[in-house]
């Protein structure tokens, strides 16, 4: 059991049952928990012969950090994608890729929110550097509401080199920066695209910025100078979605 991970929350556990049921070894519900929104989860567990047990809520509180909603699953360790897997994914992609890069985002809540947004926008994958970045944790999975089990999260050793390879494949690299001259709404986002979001406060690293084909900014009309990275990610990705739908 020590090799198993614990994930929690209704959406995260249900998404894992839908997409990777063989990874789920045991599901625990808090004692007396019974409500309509658990019906799908329990049906999936029964279909995949995953045992479901009950535990005291205080015991479950000790298992995980965060609001578990009375649902905890023991699962085999998750797999973070590597660069070769990304290349294979791009080979199979029939529509213009839309890749999100998070450069130095270390907060797990922000990573989870960005994964959720990227999945909702139909992004091909999310790329993060292996160092100085948040990675998949139970908190990330909970915040992502199931998206962490669907969208590929690719951890790369050398982000600059990865960007070069993507450019060689014909993808355009667009970075977000507050000092950029062009607003995102003026940039063509309909082609094969890499969208880079930097860490809050610091922004993109110098080497990452140097590999951008274009820099864009979000117009800020109020007194604040920037948005939370997950909010900015949503604005940028869905502008790309909007442009692509208009072009059809």
Swiss-Prot record:
Where it sits in the cell: the answer is:
Cytoplasm
Q: Which UniProt keywords apply?
A: Cytoplasm, Methyltransferase, rRNA processing, S-adenosyl-L-methionine, Transferase
Cross-referenced SUPFAM superfamilies, in alphabetical order? alpha/beta knot (SSF75217), L30e-like (SSF55315)
The family database entries (Gene3D superfamilies) matched by this protein are listed as: 3.30.1330.30, 3.40.1280.10
User: What GO terms are given for molecular function?
Assistant: RNA binding; rRNA (guanosine-2'-O-)-methyltransferase activity
What does the similarity note say? Belongs to the class IV-like SAM-binding methyltransferase superfamily. RNA methyltransferase TrmH family. RlmB subfamily.
Q: Which PANTHER family match?
A: 23S RRNA (GUANOSINE-2'-O-)-METHYLTRANSFERASE RLMB
Question: What is the protein name stated in its UniProt record?
Answer: 23S rRNA (guanosine-2'-O-)-methyltransferase RlmB
- Organismal lineage: Bacteria, Pseudomonadati, Pseudomonadota, Gammaproteobacteria, Pseudomonadales
Q: Which gene encodes it?
A: rlmB
């Amino acid at each position: 059991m020590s090799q198993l991970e614990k994930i929690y929350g209704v959406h995260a556990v249900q998404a894992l049952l839908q997409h990777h049921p063989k990874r789920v070894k045991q599901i625990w519900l808090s004692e007396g928990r019974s409500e309509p929104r658990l019906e799908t989860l329990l049906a999936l567990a029964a279909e995949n012969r995953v045992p479901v047990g009950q535990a005291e809520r205080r015991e479950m509180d000790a298992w995980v950090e965060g609001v578990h909603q009375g649902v905890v699953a023991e699962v085999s360790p998750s797999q973070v994608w590597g660069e070769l897997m990304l290349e294979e994914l791009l080979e199979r992609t029939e529509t213009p890729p839309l890749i999100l890069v998070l450069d130095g985002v270390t907060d797990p809540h922000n990573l989870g929110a960005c994964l959720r947004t990227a999945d909702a926008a139909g992004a091909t994958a999310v790329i993060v550097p292996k160092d100085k970045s948040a990675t998949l944790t139970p908190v990330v999975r909970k915040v992502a509401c199931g998206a962490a089990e669907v969208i590929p999260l690719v951890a790369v050793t050398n982000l600059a080199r990865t960007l070069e390879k993507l450019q060689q494949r014909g993808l355009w690299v667009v970075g977000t920066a507050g000092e950029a001259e062009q607003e995102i709404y003026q940039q063509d986002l309909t082609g094969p695209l890499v969208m880079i979001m930097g860490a809050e406060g610091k922004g993109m690293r110098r080497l990452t910025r140097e590999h951008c084909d274009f820099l864009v900014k979000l117009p800020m009309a109020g007194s604040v100078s920037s948005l939370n990275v997950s909010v900015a990610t949503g604005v940028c990705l869905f502008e790309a979605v909007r442009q692509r739908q208009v072009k059809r």
